[in-house]
Design a protein with these regions (language model features):
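N-terminal glycine-rich, Lys/His-bearing helix-loop that initiates the first secondary-structure elements
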Residues: 1-53
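Conserved PLP-enzyme active-site core in the AAT-like
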Residues: 2-5, 13-15, 19-22, 82-302, ...
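Glycine-rich beta-alpha junction loops
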Residues: 18-20, 33-39, 209, 226-228, ...
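Conserved N-terminal alpha-helix of the aminotransferase class I/II PLP-enzyme fold
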Residues: 36, 41-93, 115-122
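Glycine-centered tight turns that cap/initiate beta-strands
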Residues: 78, 148, 303-306, 351, ...
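PLP-dependent enzyme catalytic core of the Aspartate aminotransferase-like
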Residues: 120-122, 147-150, 283, 340, ...
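Conserved small-domain helix->loop->beta segment predominantly found in fold-type I
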Residues: 261-263, 285-286, 291-362, 376-382
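Short, well-ordered beta-strand elements within core beta-sheets of diverse protein domains
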Residues: 272-282, 329-337, 392-396
Length: 414
């Protein structure tokens, strides 16, 4: 069955499985837990190994269930292909290990998720150059580029400070310099924003977060948008220069990243994530509305020093966020005034769960300086804009009145 050109994203996601071919009239692709795949003849097996025909040989580098999810993710990002991984961090690590060599240079935002920042520090210790920049200013990115620079890495909306990268200008800069532009789209999701529109060559998503949405599966993905010319990338090995250049990068990521590192997405997790993705638009609309309403209310409270959310007109990058994104996202953060204890405040919350996760249907909160960023040290946290009293809130889809009442009670108690 052919899709209609006028169909919306949710319609296409809901009907992707049956249009891709399913047995017995099923509306979902089946779960394939097999770890290996057999063929009738040795020649067939050899041809799949050599990439001469499509198929699966060993589930570490792919299986039909993961492939069905990858098809949906490619649709979401309007890309040319996707490789799925066990987690979002596995996706980032595998991408970087697969594409970089010793002495290559990375330009990255200094406003990054703590584990991503830690990974980049590890790569620096292994011989890659690293320059951290203010990604809200493309001029700062440009100053950091050297002849050894291979890629630029940013997040759309930074976690947890909500800084919005200068996405369009950085994309133009990378295009002019022939650099690979990698954008982590986790905070916005492909429903709110497609990095392809600003020139991103590769897009990373943590599927554990809003795309899966239900907090019941770990996963990550790298999608090739088709924008980057891989024939210009010096690090593509000869075995992966097969067919048109647009497929080279993702093939090397699947082989040197997924196959060799082995951070494979479990088939049952892929199945749950694919189901969750079908309601992405509905969930994001609700969560983003809740987040903006809660942020607006918090910003007016006397016990709150600062609120960070791109949807607020007071946000430094509000104009860009409004121009690029359908909404400001479901993540916000805020600081209490100096007289209030952020840990005591969190203890007073009842509906909101104290958890390090985000992108869940449930609203979650965490004191970031004391938990996920404590390893960074005070000086590094200060450079990243993370105050000791900063609380990150991943806003879910609960009834807004219940969330506001929960925060109101907690503020009154401290």
């Amino acid at each position: 069955m052919e899709k209609k050109a006028s169909e919306g994203l949710t319609t296409r996601l809901l009907h992707a499985d049956r249009r891709g071919g399913v047995e017995h009239g099923a509306t979902h692709k089946p779960l394939h837990p097999s770890s290996a795949f057999g063929y009738d003849t040795a020649r067939e097996l050899v041809s799949v190994f050599k990439g001469e025909r499509s198929g699966h040989v060993y589930a570490r580098q792919g299986n039909p269930t993961n492939a069905a999810l990858e098809t949906k993710l490619t649709l979401l990002e309007d890309g040319v292909g996707t490789v799925s991984f066990a987690t979002g961090m596995a996706a980032i690590a595998s991408l970087l290990v697969a594409l970089l060599k010793r002495d290559d240079h990375i330009v990255a935002s200094r406003f990054l998720f703590g584990n991503t920042a830690s990974l980049l520090n590890t790569l620096e210790g292994l011989g890659c150059g690293l320059t951290l920049v203010d990604a809200t200013d493309a001029a700062d990115v440009e100053r950091a580029i050297t002849p050894r620079t291979r890629l630029v890495f940013v997040e759309t909306i930074a976690n947890p400070g909500t800084q919005v990268a200068d996405l369009e200008a950085i994309g133009k800069l990378c295009g002019e310099r022939g650099l690979l532009y990698v954008v982590d789209n986790t905070m916005t999701t492909p429903y709110l924003f497609r990095p392809k529109t600003v020139g991103a060559g590769l897009v990373v998503n943590s599927l554990t977060k809003s795309i899966g949405g239900h907090g019941n599966a770990l996963g990550g993905a790298v999608t090739d948008t088709g924008v980057f010319d891989w024939s210009r990338f010096a690090n593509i090995a000869e075995p992966y220069k097969k067919g048109e250049p647009r497929g080279w990068g993702l093939l090397q990521i699947r082989k040197r990243g997924l196959r060799d590192i082995g951070a494979t997405l479990a088939a049952d997790a892929a199945h749950r994530i694919a189901t969750g993705a079908e309601t992405l638009a509905l969930r994001m609309d609700r969560a983003c509305d809740n987040a903006l309403r809660l942020a607006t209310w918090l910003a007016a409270q006397p016990g709150v020093k600062r609120v960070n959310h791109p949807g607020l007109e007071t946000h430094p990058q509000h104009a860009n966020a409004k121009r690029w994104f359908k909404a400001g996202g479901a993540l916000m953060s805020f600081e209490l005034d100096d007289a209030r204890d952020c840990l005591a405040f969190l203890d007073r919350l009842d509906v909101v769960i104290k958890s390090s996760h985000l992108g869940d249907n449930r609203t979650l909160a965490i004191p970031v300086a004391h938990t996920i960023f404590w390893e960074m040290g005070a000086q590094r946290r200060q450079a990243m804009g993370i105050a000791d009293s900063l609380i990150r809130v991943s806003v879910g889809i609960e009834d807004h009145e219940d969330l506001r009442a929960d925060f109101e009670r907690a503020l009154a108690a401290v």
